[in-house]
Amino acid sequence: MDILKDLTGITGAGFVTDDETVLSGYASDLSFSAGTKPEAEVCPDTTEEVSRIVKWANENNMPLIPVSSPVHLYGSTIPKQGGVIVNMRRFDEIYEIDTVNRFVRIGTGVSWEKLTAALREQGMRVILPLTPRSDRSVATDHLEREVTTSMVY
């Protein structure tokens, strides 16, 4: 099995890497959890590509670890037995901002920076986590249960 060749066949060139520097960054986070370095990182752009990656992983008995931000806190994205990081950063579209009902629909890779800028243009704002990082995805903060702040008057 040639991981890079197989995954490049799914996502196209430029969206799969086995670069040591990139992969080493996934072997730990801000927690005390121990882990190992993944074999590769792949960055799909469509749900069809994600589906094909999952099918490939099942056929090759390869663990997949989904991520959507560069920073993690609780060990949830550290590979325990190698595998492939599925980086969802390219899913960074804001699908809808509903100013009447006050909600948004976003992709898993949308960062706080992108969301707050888009909402500001609409005269809106979002309740942020206690210590937001502009490059961290909104989805990651919600999945990792980051505490949000609420103004009380």
Regions found by a protein language model. Give the residues of each.
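N-terminal flexible segment immediately upstream of the FAD-binding catalytic core
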Residues: M1-K55, E59, V71-R102, T131, ...
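FAD-binding subdomain of flavoenzyme oxidoreductases
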Residues: E93-I97, I106-Y153
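Short hydrophobic alpha-helical runs that function as membrane-insertion/retention elements
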Residues: I65-P66, L128
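Residue-level detector of anion-binding/catalytic polar loops
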Residues: M62-P63, R125
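Short beta-strand segments
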Residues: V67, N87, G107
